[in-house]
């Protein structure tokens, strides 16, 4: 599907054939559609080289060679805002060491600058974080790095759909505890149409982890999958890039969703993503911890100034 196409509708579920006509092959479609939803696709290609080459089609992102760590100049503050200047004044030694560590991905070329900023955006905008200042900072930095409106919007959609893990956690517990308490679901209509879920089953991509919330509310589950399929089959990002974003969202310190982290690391490796690239994503997760300083240091400075003023 062409970026920004008006063809996508609310509950449109693209078929593999539709995706081929829009520049995606079946493997790319299945991989992209299953990314956030917790599936791994291995359709039609064998061998890491073939997978890697296919995954890169249609991408304008220049890939760094695995293990290549050429130093490059930093043109922005990375994860930092003005708080860094204050930290330098208060504790220059710690500020120097912390800045060196946190700016590492921006100084190295393991990942393209645009992808670094989009991953950082995902971490800040995620429904488990909702950091307004960080979201604005990395949207601006991503635009400066060449990201398009549709790419940024896609990251925000992914950051929104992360919330499905509430059902991944809670639905099995609800069924178990209801059974123990002797409580049963109220009768409902049989034969409800669930085309999105049916599509996933046809492709062999249905995950049994979804069975509990499908059992509890099949119609709503299908609505969710229709939403997710419409997003991930768009072709805005390559399957490799989708997996990197998914790893970041699941491994984030505000989420720490182990099943998804493992699933997406496994899928990324199968697609030819290097260990170094995946480690960069994990580093970016850790580095966003300096948001504590971005938040707290200005408040501390303000409160200290108020006390100083009252005493004088």
Protein language model regions, located:
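Amphipathic, charged-and-aliphatic alpha-helical interface segments
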Residues: 116-131, 241-257
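Short helix-coil transition sites and intra-membrane helix breaks within transmembrane domains
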Residues: 127-133, 163-167, 253-259, 290-293
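Short acidic/histidine-centered micro-motifs embedded in hydrophobic/aromatic stretches
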Residues: 122, 155-159, 177, 248, ...
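Hydrophobic, ordered structural segments
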Residues: 153-175
